[in-house]
Regions:
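Short beta-edge/loop segments at beta->alpha junctions of small alpha/beta modules
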Residues: 1-73, 107, 168-178, 183
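Short, surface-exposed acidic
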Residues: 26-28, 90-91, 199
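An N-terminal domain-start capping segment
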Residues: 1-26, 105-106, 122-125, 129-137, ...
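Short, intrinsically disordered, mixed-charge
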Residues: 37, 83, 87, 145-148
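Exposed, interaction-prone assembly regions rather than primary DNA-binding/catalytic cores
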Residues: 78-128, 134
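Hydrophobic alpha-helical interaction segments
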Residues: 124-250
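Hydrophobic alpha-helix position signal
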Residues: 35, 81-82, 190
Length: 250
């Protein structure tokens, strides 16, 4: 079938992609209908298709490739980025997809694709057909919105596994959020887990300089569970963080 080999290379595609191959929208629509009828492709959602393995009738693309194609600026974020980097503790079947262009949540092939609005376009890397937040942006976003990171314990376990981080990137990214609470939360976690992160102590100190005298709870979950006040960071944190992290004297 003409153009099938090129479509196979795309793995995930929309009508515009096929139009670029056929140079004719009607031909493109006919080709998509034919491929659907042969079970060579599956419809993911309106105007989004995934190529199938002909023998097993299973989709070739993984959830990350699909998510990255939902919108022209969409990318993997929050816990799904942890998942992409292989540092998850629990298996999640929700794929968090950030974009400036809203789409309706949908499910496909065992995964729920959930839209997360984003006004930022920094800290995003392209790996083949996948767009995903880099590790530094991922940890900031997940610390900022722990509910999208699987909760406090899941966040902590993922941070333990994420590995080395670029402290300069973290400070650069934090400026965009302009949040004293986030400086406190990120600075606290960097200090607590810096044996693994390996960031310069000056980065942690810079975070501390950015906070004021106001006291913050780490998140809403912290209010409901055992917690402890850390005066250095003006932060009330989950007690589970302190039983697992470095022994520090605040």
């Amino acid at each position: 079938m003409k153009n099938y080999e090129k479509i196979l290379e795309l793995k995930v595609f929309n009508l515009q992609d096929v139009c670029e191959l056929t140079d004719n929208i009607n031909t493109a629509k006919s080709l998509i209908r034919a491929l659907l009828s042969l079970n060579y492709i599956k419809r993911v959602k309106h105007n989004l298709y995934a190529v199938c393995n002909i023998e097993f009738k299973s989709v070739i693309a993984d959830q990350y490739m699909i998510a990255s194609k939902i919108k022209d600026d969409s990318y993997i974020s929050y816990h799904s980025a942890f998942d992409y980097y292989g540092v998850k503790n629990q298996m999640f079947y929700t794929v968090y997809v950030s974009s400036k262009k809203r789409f309706a949540d949908f499910d496909f092939d065992g995964y729920d694709y959930s839209f997360v609005n984003s006004k930022y376009d920094f800290g995003i890397v392209q790996n083949g057909k996948v767009r995903v937040t880099d590790k530094e942006r991922t940890i900031i976003d997940c610390i900022n919105k722990t509910e999208l990171a699987g909760g406090d314990e899941e966040l902590f376990l993922c941070l333990e596994l994420i590995g080395k981080l670029d402290g300069k990137k973290i400070l650069k990214y934090l400026k965009h959020y302009n949040s004293q609470k986030l400086y406190a939360k990120v600075g606290f976690m960097l200090e607590l887990l810096n044996d693994g992160f390996g960031v310069d102590e000056k980065v942690i100190e810079e975070c501390r300089k950015r906070i004021n005298g106001r006291t913050y709870y780490f998140d809403n979950e912290t209010k409901k569970n055992k917690n402890k006040y850390i005066s250095k960071w003006n932060l009330v944190v989950p007690e589970i963080f302190l039983t697992r992290g470095r022994t520090l004297h605040w």
